[in-house]
């Protein structure tokens, strides 16, 4: 997610990466309606999202992580990694988040097969400081990333990152203490794990929601990917710091999206 006023290239990047702005209340320009991402196996030897390639004929091998990540914890087949300055409590929250999202479904199996993993960034780390994403500075510049507090869904590389402070509920975190991992996992689920009919249904519901005047100047209006991810955030937690835009709110505000998410994730 990005703040309003960014250049078109940055808006497009936000749509592609599933980035989250430092302020959840900031509106964002609509991003492009990109082609459906195909859930394919990533290159397990790639160390950054710019150099990754896909070879679906190659037998799957164990993913190799950068040596910086001294913490590695597997949860439901999905690996959580973190650097040395990340408190174990933050990794615990990431684990609880994953277990909650996948408690009523088996979507984690598809993500695990794709090699998806979660990065918990250190408190003072920005996106470009992480081994996987540093290469994006040349591609997108630094300005875009000053507005980003979480990122996911590089099409060739199912990886998401959030800051440890936000997982711990610390208001000094990039997302002001909101556990934005629900949003970022929503991107991974949407791009890699949902069935095609549900994927296309989300596009139709997004269009219907905009026609009905929903999500005016809210980040969910950016594109159908952010619509799904923001819905996921509300379904499991809340979109806002006050906790008001939660599952109950979603059920009444956008019942069609609520029912789709309930069918995908379970109760």
Which residue ranges define each predicted feature?
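Metalloprotease/metallohydrolase-associated module, dominated by Zn2+-dependent proteases
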Residues: 18, 140-161, 171, 175, ...
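A cross-kingdom marker for long, charged
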Residues: 31-38, 45-63, 238-267
């Amino acid at each position: 997610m990005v703040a309003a006023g960014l250049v078109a290239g940055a808006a497009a990047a936000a749509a592609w990466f599933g980035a989250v702005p430092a302020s959840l209340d900031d509106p964002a320009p609509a991003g492009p309606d990109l082609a459906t991402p195909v859930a394919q196996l990533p290159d397990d030897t790639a160390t950054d999202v710019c150099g990754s390639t896909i070879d679906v004929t190659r037998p799957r091998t164990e993913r190799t992580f950068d040596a910086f990540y001294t913490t590695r914890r597997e949860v439901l087949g999905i690996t959580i990694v973190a650097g040395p300055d990340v408190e174990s409590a933050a990794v615990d929250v990431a684990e609880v988040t994953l277990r909650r999202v996948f408690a009523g479904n088996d979507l984690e199996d598809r993500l695990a097969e794709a090699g998806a993993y979660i990065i918990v960034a250190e408190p003072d780390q920005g996106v470009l400081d992480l081994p996987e994403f540093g290469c994006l500075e040349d591609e997108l510049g630094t300005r875009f990333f000053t507005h980003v507090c979480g990122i996911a869904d590089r099409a060739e590389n199912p990886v998401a990152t959030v800051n440890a402070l936000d997982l711990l509920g610390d208001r000094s975190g990039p997302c002001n203490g909101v556990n934005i991992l629900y949003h970022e996992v929503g991107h991974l689920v949407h791009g890699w794990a949902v069935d095609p009919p549900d994927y296309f249904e989300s596009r139709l519901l997004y269009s219907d929601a905009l026609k009905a005047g929903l999500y005016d100047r809210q980040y969910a209006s950016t594109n159908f990917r952010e619509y799904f991810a923001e819905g996921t955030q509300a379904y499991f937690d809340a979109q806002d710091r006050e906790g008001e835009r939660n599952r109950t709110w979603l059920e009444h505000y956008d019942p069609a999206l609520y029912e789709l998410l309930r069918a995908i994730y379970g109760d």
